[in-house]
Amino acid sequence: MVWPRLVLAACLLAMPPAAAECLSQCSLCAVRTQDGPKPINPLICSLECQETLLPSEEWERCQGILSFFPSALRLRDQSGLDSRAALEEVYGELAKRARPFLQELEKSRFLPSTPAEDKFRGLLGGLGEGLGSEAMGAPQLNSGAVEAAALDFDEDPKEQVKRYGGFLRKYPKRSSEVAREGDRDGDNAGHEDLYKRYGGFLRRIRPKLKWDNQKRYGGFLRRQFKVVTRSQEDPNAYSEEFFDV
């Protein structure tokens, strides 16, 4: 029940005085012709009176009917002062009654004065702020990466080893590089550290050829390292040495 009253009040408040006069005259014509064969439609008559619709047949009929009633002519000739005063009183009462409802609706944002574009505009504004923050964050990340790279470049290699757990490619260096540098500089400390750290798997070191290993592994050393054992030596060589003595 609240919405129809609000709509009626809004229509009456937004209606100009000329439209009110047209509506009153057309309503009077409709009342006079309601029992006739062709009653006048007050809505069409009022629109034709305001020159909104063409042709103005209903309005012409209404003017012809009003010409037969002196009261209507007198009201029209006097510019409808009394009717305007009455209409103003009605409009004032309606405005007073409708003002609280309109204020409540404005507070709760139910009126069409707040379209959905405001919502989309807010979403677009949020997206724009997000994109701006991302655009500002990208240079910061890039600058942070550059600073980290500069610190890593200026940092001591041993500190980098402690920091990254020894999984760098440039430090510690490979065994071949360390061996070449040790031969040129005469410093084998780095190679020894690597040998102790990785358990001798950086370079191939042949085991010492001992007879204990020969006894232990059998003929493996003879085949692998071409070791000549006493069993393979010529026994005549020992006999010749004995005769010479």
Curated annotation (Swiss-Prot):
Cellular component annotations (GO), alphabetically ordered: axon terminus; dendrite; extracellular region; hippocampal mossy fiber to CA3 synapse; neuronal cell body; neuronal dense core vesicle; plasma membrane
Post-translational modification: The N-terminal domain contains 6 conserved cysteines thought to be involved in disulfide bonding and/or processing.
GO biological process: chemical synaptic transmission; neuropeptide signaling pathway; sensory perception
Propeptide regions on this chain: 21-161, 175-195
Localization per Swiss-Prot or TrEMBL: Secreted
Family: Belongs to the opioid neuropeptide precursor family.
Function: Leu-enkephalins compete with and mimic the effects of opiate drugs. They play a role in a number of physiologic functions, including pain perception and responses to stress.
GO MF terms held by the record: opioid peptide activity; opioid receptor binding
A Pfam family this chain is assigned to: Opiods_neuropep
Signal peptide annotation: 1-20
Protein's recorded name: Proenkephalin-B
Principal location class: secreted
Keyword terms: Cleavage on pair of basic residues, Disulfide bond, Endorphin, Neuropeptide, Neurotransmitter, Opioid peptide, Secreted, Signal
Keyword presence, Signal: yes
